[in-house]
């Protein structure tokens, strides 16, 4: 899949990004290189290959030392709701604005 310069300019327009012609051409080259890489990766036959949870272990016989999942923040809902004018069951109460 290759993009044309008009595609890049249209995408920039839709994203409300102002680009010069030089920037658009540079972006076009980068995007086409990226799409070329994706096409190369999609062409590789990966049948029979198991996905790796930790790819580093496939290169070296090591295990990654991952930290334990631990709660680092306490529940401060009450502290945050204390200055609110009105709360109920942990929710902020606001005036009705749509009838």
From Swiss-Prot:
Its EC number is 6.3.5.-. It is an enzyme of class 6 (ligase). Keywords: ATP-binding, Ligase, Nucleotide-binding, Protein biosynthesis. It holds the Pfam family GatC. The keyword Protein biosynthesis applies. Transmembrane segments: none annotated. Belongs to the GatC family. This is Aspartyl/glutamyl-tRNA(Asn/Gln) amidotransferase subunit C. One of its GO terms (biological process) is translation. GO terms for molecular function: asparaginyl-tRNA synthase (glutamine-hydrolyzing) activity; ATP binding; glutaminyl-tRNA synthase (glutamine-hydrolyzing) activity. Heterotrimer of A, B and C subunits. SUPFAM superfamilies: Glu-tRNAGln amidotransferase C subunit (SSF141000). Allows the formation of correctly charged Asn-tRNA(Asn) or Gln-tRNA(Gln) through the transamidation of misacylated Asp-tRNA(Asn) or Glu-tRNA(Gln) in organisms which lack either or both of asparaginyl-tRNA or glutaminyl-tRNA synthetases. The reaction takes place in the presence of glutamine and ATP through an activated phospho-Asp-tRNA(Asn) or phospho-Glu-tRNA(Gln). It comes from the Bacteria. It comes from Cupriavidus metallidurans (strain ATCC 43123 / DSM 2839 / NBRC 102507 / CH34) (Ralstonia metallidurans). Coiled coil: none annotated. It catalyses: L-glutamyl-tRNA(Gln) + L-glutamine + ATP + H2O = L-glutaminyl-tRNA(Gln) + L-glutamate + ADP + phosphate + H(+); L-aspartyl-tRNA(Asn) + L-glutamine + ATP + H2O = L-asparaginyl-tRNA(Asn) + L-glutamate + ADP + phosphate + 2 H(+). The gene is gatC.
